[in-house]
């Protein structure tokens, strides 16, 4: 079995990855809160963990990897946006309209980015019973308390096992200093956080846990603990009915670096306290921040970019007539290619120029694949060097450098295999002879070009200049540029060719 090494946020070092069960490799990633269209920061996380999903599937087998990415569909931001957009509707109806629209758009956007569907995408509102049960377990074990129709987690209860703040590498004093000044009077300590809260009149609410007599809704952190339990523990022998702590740990938990504190710190506190474990997951992976043109992305700065706005932008010219779907899929793959050129843990600076450059390079890769359409029918294994690069903490920049070498060497099969693992290859574009993305490539392949060059050299040798020029012009019209030279050893005329750069 191939050795994988990843940087573990939990230990702050690279570690060999050994799954708990190689036939059931389990990955959980925090997904979006669906109150608005997803932005390119969301896109980075989605793309990074899609590549990880693809790598795990390659190593352990497609059917042996379980990837769960949750959907948060109950949140104060959702309530506020729904009320603003649909003031004519009752709030629950407005929320339903908003979340269905944004959920559908998120699915379309991620598909255009070349992402595989996760194994499961649980929605918070479908797991309220799991949340209530988990909260009641925490109350039973003395890790939570009820006050004024709230349930709060008691940070003091778990200071030593595991130490609260250890994941984020923060002391309690540091966290207290960063806490809000106006701490709710009903909290025992300022660092205690909400597991469940009452709903105001007109707000969405559900039956509360532990006999609380009013309707309420869950806190953000308990949602992920409950959904990961429901999807990655309970189906595999763990969960609240299991007394074995070792059965209540899964393999990998991922998300953006901004989630380390407080969200992931609080997830760990809840889950470890409920199950008596020292770890919630063995490996924690976080992608770095994203900036736009060197600045923090912010609506106030006017540089807030949604995935949808990129998919619908015209930043690249094509020869053929494209459908809107094809344009959006091309834009999505271009954005994906652009993001993967930065290591997932490093900050990423998104620029319009970089997107165009990435799109141009990706187009040239597809040109080669279209030329070598017949060669593409051969079945060859993925080059080990690409897997080696990705196996070392998902080193996508190094792996893409290898793909560039394949392109320069004209090795279409190796290039295509690598692109496929990266989620950059749409087979239908290569297989379709008259794909409008690459209209000038019709009936062209390297063998055809070589034959035409050989014929041109024969004509030049016979001094049939006009006929030789006709072949040159014919190939130029198809985007093929000829470069004449001489063999340094024999002195004979030679001709190299390349595709015109767009």
Curated annotation (Swiss-Prot):
One of the record's GO molecular function terms: zinc ion binding
UniProt keyword Cell inner membrane present: no
Enzyme class: ligase
E.C. designation(s): 6.1.1.16
Details of cofactor binding: Binds 1 zinc ion per subunit.
Sequence positions that bind Zn(2+): 30, 224, 263, 267
Motif ('HIGH' region): 32-42
SMART domains in alphabetical order: DALR_2 (SM00840)
Signal peptide: none
Cofactor: Zn(2+)
Subcellular localization: Cytoplasm
Keywords carried by this UniProt record: Aminoacyl-tRNA synthetase, ATP-binding, Cytoplasm, Ligase, Metal-binding, Nucleotide-binding, Protein biosynthesis, Zinc
Main localization of the protein described in the UniProt heading: cytoplasm
Catalytic activity: tRNA(Cys) + L-cysteine + ATP = L-cysteinyl-tRNA(Cys) + AMP + diphosphate
Positions occupied by motif 'KMSKS' region: 296-300
Positions of ATP binding: 299
Pfam families: CysS_C, tRNA-synt_1e
GO biological process: cysteinyl-tRNA aminoacylation
GO cellular component, as recorded: cytosol
Subunit structure: Monomer.
Family to which the UniProt record says this protein belongs: Belongs to the class-I aminoacyl-tRNA synthetase family.
PANTHER family attached to this UniProt entry: CYSTEINE--TRNA LIGASE, CYTOPLASMIC (PTHR10890:SF3), CYSTEINYL-TRNA SYNTHETASE (PTHR10890)
Protein name: Cysteine--tRNA ligase
Phylogenetic lineage: Bacteria, Pseudomonadati, Pseudomonadota, Alphaproteobacteria, Hyphomicrobiales
Gene (UniProt): cysS
